[in-house]
């Protein structure tokens, strides 16, 4: 699965830990380049992980994998992300013929919820 994450996602260090029907769990070791000037994980990195976790969950929501693109996303930053690792858990809320609603949550290495997001994705075929 990790070889299918694409070059950007591999570049930033994302790894798929578990993928099931309509679910995805990603992990990423926090590196210095993921941090903002305050020393916490940059919001763009958080948004990337929300998008990828929700997107992979949407890809595997049905009997066969389907290609998706993100139509819209909404992130809620609840607490600064610090520590050594980010855990992302994505799940499908509803998958239709053309669109999918997914939700993803980010946790720090202490298991604290730090960020949550909703994604609307469009199926390409």
Question: Language-model features: where?
Answer:
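Terminal targeting signals and extreme-terminal segments of soluble enzymes
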Residues: 1-125
């Amino acid at each position: 699965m990790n070889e299918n994450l694409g070059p950007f996602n591999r570049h930033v260090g994302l790894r798929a830990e578990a993928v099931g029907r309509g679910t995805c769990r990603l992990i990423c070791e926090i590196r210095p380049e993921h941090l903002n000037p305050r020393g916490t994980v940059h919001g763009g990195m958080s948004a990337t992980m929300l998008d990828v976790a929700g997107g992979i969950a949407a890809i595997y929501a049905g009997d066969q994998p389907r290609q998706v693109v993100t139509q819209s996303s909404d992130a809620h930053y609840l607490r600064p992300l610090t520590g050594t690792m980010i855990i992302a858990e994505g799940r499908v809320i509803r998958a239709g013929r053309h669109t999918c609603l997914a939700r993803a949550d980010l946790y720090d290495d202490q298991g604290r919820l730090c960020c949550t997001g909703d994604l609307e994705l469009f199926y390409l075929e």
